[in-house]
Amino acid sequence: MSADCPSFPVSTSGLLAAWPRLLRLPTQHPAGFYLVCIAVFCERWAAYMLGSSLVLMLCERYGYSRADALRLAGIVNAATYLGTLPGGIASDRAGHPARWLGASMGLLAVGYAALVLTAPAALWLALGLLLVGHALFKPNTQAAIASQYPVGDSRLDAAQILFYIAVNAGATLGSTVAGLLIHRTGWSVAFETAAVVMLVGLLALILGHKVLRLRPATMQHLGPDVAKLGTSPPALRAKLIGALILAMVLYTIGCGQVEGSLLLWAQDRTNRALLGTEIPATWFVGLPAVLVMLLAPVQLGFLRQLQRRIATPRLVAWGLCAVALAFAALLPAALGHTEQRASMGWLVACLTLLAIGELLVAPLGLSLLLRLAPPRFIGALVGAWYVSRALGFWLAAEIGVLWIGGSPVAMLALLMGLSLAGAVMLWWASRDTFKRRDQNC
């Protein structure tokens, strides 16, 4: 455990500071880092209880058409990412990311509790609270983690992988529990559970506030270190940054189908029978998170070897190729008899390839952006990154609407083409910037 983290042997904070060692977790990380992981685990659990079933809830509970439900789900996803820019600016000005985390978790708990009510007005109130809560929560998780480490600390790389595992563990449990509760008890109990999960995370933050002390000296972000990394001419770096952000839009269009079109594919076109029972469609939404959680430690072990052979931009490009292959895996099922449900193996293959693509695109893409960005523009470019995710989710919903009335084969071909276009664009943009190895990224 970091020497910066105090030990309080008899207090609640002392117990929280000691629990990573008791659970045999890597003790080189501060206890405050693990506390943030608990918070994001709870937030993702609750978020996926709604996200994995939002389209179905809008159709079954509120009478939306599938097209309108997909559009609203896309708007909600987009607004969640767009809100992080003003949310991050507000928290930067006020400071104390741990306090903002606590406030955002309280808003999220109230938002999920409001979904227990069935009135349409309660739906809009809940969505509003959830959007504000997520706008504050997302940027402050990274700020809170950064506050636990000295600037340039080499442990941050491993910390981000562990953080990513916590994110996907919460997402996995959320979609799994949602499928069970909605199928057996209905929507209200599922959202009551989501609210309770958020309150548990908030309680952990309150009890452990002493190990989440803000260290102002570590809140200088990565400016001096980033300035040493990119030695390519500014014009070439700007070209790669632009290609990376555009590629992120195209990647998000593909991965954004999981909670929309692929959820409906699982519901309507997939034979979900297994051992005498039927697997809930929402479980397929959580499968990529399970796979990411399992594969992330493998990625951590092999990443340095991969980067010695392949430049980081091209690793991201290979991730986009994996997304294209994911939709190619569904082509045999789409070309089969429409009156028969397809084997779930095709959908599982698709989701597995999407998980591999996610591991290569999401963490490596953001890391590459931070390394290429001029120090004074890091905040703006990270905001542009999230805006690209928002645009991608909106376009994903629009493509999902076209999928309802169009040819599945044509939609799969479109999604394959968009992902491959992103890969080619990154490959082209990096050909001059990274001619040999990824030494500067």
Q: What is each of the regions a protein language model found here?
A:
Residues 71-89, 286-299:
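Central cavity-lining transmembrane alpha-helices of secondary-active solute carriers
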Residues 136-150, 360-373:
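Intracellular juxtamembrane helix-capping segments at the cytosolic ends
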Residues 157-176, 182, 195-201, 384-396:
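Glycine-rich segments within core transmembrane alpha-helices of 12-TM secondary carriers
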Residues 99-114, 314-329:
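Structural signature of the two symmetry-related core transmembrane helices
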Residues 50-68, 260-281:
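Short amphipathic helix-loop junctions that connect adjacent transmembrane helices
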Residues 25-60, 237-258, 352, 356:
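Pair of pore-lining "gating" transmembrane helices in MFS-fold secondary transporters
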Residues 116-127, 332-348:
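Helix-loop junctions at membrane interfaces in 12-TM secondary transporters
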Residues 2-27, 31, 151-152, 178-277, ...:
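Intracellular loop-helix junctions on the cytosolic face of multi-pass helical membrane proteins
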